[in-house]
Amino acid sequence: MKKHLLAVAIAALAASSAMAQANDTLAKVKSSGSITLGVRESSGALAYTLGDGKYVGFHTEMAENIVKDIQKQVGAANVAVKYQPVTSQNRIPLVVNGTVDLECGSTTNDLNRQKDVDFANTTYMEQVRIAVNAKSGINDVKDLNGKTVATTTGTTSV
């Protein structure tokens, strides 16, 4: 019973912390009149740059629609949108330190990241694959033992 109460208390504390962060962000947007979107420059159809500070893609457009809702929530006639390019390596730290208010890229929602940031509902799922030379003899992930593998820092692809 005590463990159950402790679990409920921890869950309530986590929920109140997330709500406080959301309220802090809304207050920041209301007082500054702007919001900063963390955008990927080359994340396939989800988020990419057209150059000259213009960003498009499924998640970018979704975030811009969220900004319209935020604008209504804070009672602002207009909320200026600033775009901050982010990478796999810096996207989570920039949300945590407040440089970015909302990141709109191809970021995996996992338990480790949930310790630092809150996620919206999942909107896209994919499966990571590997590519090797057909003559390499590598047919499965276990065949990579002892081999050099390249990946991007800050991703969940490995």
Description of each model-found segment:
Residues 1-20:
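Gram-negative bacterial Sec-dependent N-terminal signal peptides
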Residues 21-27:
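Cleaved targeting-peptide boundary
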Residues 22, 32-103:
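Extracytoplasmic small-molecule ligand-binding "clamshell" domains
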Residues 23, 43-45, 52, 114-116, ...:
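Generic secondary-structure boundary/loop-capping signal
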Residues 29-30, 144:
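Short, flexible coil/linker segments at domain boundaries that flank nucleotide/cofactor-interacting
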Residues 36-45, 55-71, 108, 126-158:
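Bilobed "Venus flytrap"/periplasmic-binding protein-like clamshell domains
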Residues 76-143:
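Acidic, polar ligand-binding/catalytic clefts
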